[in-house]
A protein has these predicted regions:
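Charge-rich, solvent-exposed alpha-helical interaction surfaces
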Residues: 129-132, 136
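C-terminal lobe/hinge of AMP-binding adenylation domains
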Residues: 20-21
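A conserved beta-turn-beta hairpin within the catalytic core of GNAT-like acetyltransferases
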Residues: 25-28
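Catalytic cores of nucleic-acid ligases and guanylyltransferases
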Residues: 140
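A short gly/proline-enriched turn/hairpin at secondary-structure junctions
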Residues: 31-32
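Conserved N-terminal beta-strand and adjoining loop/helix that marks the start
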Residues: 1-17
């Protein structure tokens, strides 16, 4: 099974979008928009569909970049995390999967965080990539 998550970064503020989950798995934890890739769907197609479902739209973006691919030990599950740079923060129109949202500075992690995202943000390689992305797209 494949799934995808997208970390929106506002070029104007340098902050990232998080969603507060309201679902059965890990309710009350903070995560990213995204979900399961349907049969016959591409990663990008699934990402766009999930964002439309969870945010009300897939916002216009400056750049879309793969950040990480996690594969479970048994090879059955893949989770693809992307960074999507948008010009400005936006107000998502949340569906019933989420209770709220927050735009936060990198390193200001919402708590409790979804365990998969927590594992990702604690990787030094991810911290380095995020810092590089922020530096590349930071407005003066």
């Amino acid at each position: 099974m494949k799934a995808v998550g997208v970390w929106f970064l506002s070029q104007t503020t340098g902050r990232y979008l998080y969603l507060l989950r309201n679902d059965i798995k890990h309710p009350g934890s903070w995560g990213l928009p995204g979900g399961k890739i349907e049969t016959g769907e591409t990663l990008l197609g699934g990402m766009e569909r999930e964002c439309v479902e969870e945010l009300g739209s897939f916002p216009n973006y400056t750049r879309l970049m793969p950040l990480e691919k996690f594969t479970s030990a048994d090879g059955v599950f893949e989770y693809h995390t992307w960074v999507c740079v948008v010009d400005q923060e936006f107000v998502p129109v949340l569906n019933d999967e989420h209770l709220g949202y927050a735009w936060l500075d990198q390193g200001t992690w919402p708590r409790p965080m979804h365990p998969g995202l927590w594992s990702t943000v604690n990787l030094e390689s991810i911290q380095t990539k995020l810092a590089s992305i922020e530096n590349a797209f930071q407005k003066s």
